[in-house]
């Protein structure tokens, strides 16, 4: 590969770690979750593949201290405020936030923080927990809203499950493969099938209970979130996902 890309990645990470002091705004938890996850993935890659030596100014112990500090001291407080608050958002927020909490736990080798994210996934009152975002039928908390947010919501749950899988925990299997059911439901809806069950959702906040029908906005506009679940359930585990497969082969 071209070492200049690695150098640029390190420049970006060091730049943020040395200057970022606060994340603020009305969507700050979502920003911290989504944008932070991209940063922490890059940091994880560089930390273990581009070490400092006599030839390149790669990852050093100083980088570990400063970049871990950024995630703990700038990102985590925003995420923690959301986690501890009374539920107030659609589930894609909670899923995005919790995914980043887990990622920080992994990156910083903080097992209690990682376990906190696992507990949120199973047990939180927030719309972003697994049982509150995906019903047994596969319907998603935001199915009555639009399809773009559904793809985001189920996608972040799959990414979280993949992070946990790398740590030896199988969250993909939780609640009888609930994530898989969500993907199959989402795929079937967006492929144009009409024989899909839909119920008015009673969400955790009480604010999003007025969607009477399937959300048609962004219908059939597929985002790149289907591959990760298909790879796990079909390629790793040998479980059929016929509608998700149709999405990927369309």
Label for each model-derived stretch:
Residues 1-168:
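Aromatic-lined, polymer-binding surfaces characteristic
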Residues 171-250:
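CBM-like carbohydrate-recognition segments
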């Amino acid at each position: 590969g071209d070492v200049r890309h690695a150098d640029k990645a390190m420049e970006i990470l060091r730049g943020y770690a040395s200057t970022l002091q606060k994340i603020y705004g009305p969507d700050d938890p979502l920003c911290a979750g989504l944008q932070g996850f991209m940063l922490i993935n890059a940091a994880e890659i560089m930390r273990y593949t581009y070490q400092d030596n006599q030839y390149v100014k790669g990852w050093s112990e100083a980088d570990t201290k400063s970049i871990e500090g950024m995630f703990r001291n700038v990102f985590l407080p925003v995420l923690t405020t959301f986690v501890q608050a009374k539920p107030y958002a659609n589930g894609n927020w909670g899923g995005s936030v919790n995914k980043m909490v887990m990622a920080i736990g992994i990156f910083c080798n903080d097992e209690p923080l990682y376990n906190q994210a696992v507990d949120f996934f199973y047990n939180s009152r927030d719309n972003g927990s697994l049982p509150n975002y995906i019903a047994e039928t596969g319907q998603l908390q935001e199915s009555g809203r639009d399809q773009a947010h559904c793809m985001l919501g189920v996608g972040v749950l799959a990414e979280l499950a993949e992070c946990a899988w790398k740590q030896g925990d199988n969250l993909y299997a939780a609640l009888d493969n609930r994530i898989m059911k969500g993907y199959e439901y989402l795929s079937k809806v967006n492929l144009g099938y009409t024989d899909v069950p839909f119920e008015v959702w009673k969400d955790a906040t009480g604010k999003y209970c007025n969607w009477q029908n399937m959300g048609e906005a962004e219908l059939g506009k597929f985002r790149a979130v289907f591959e990760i679940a298909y790879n796990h359930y079909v390629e790793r585990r040998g479980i059929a996902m016929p509608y998700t497969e149709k999405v990927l082969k369309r």
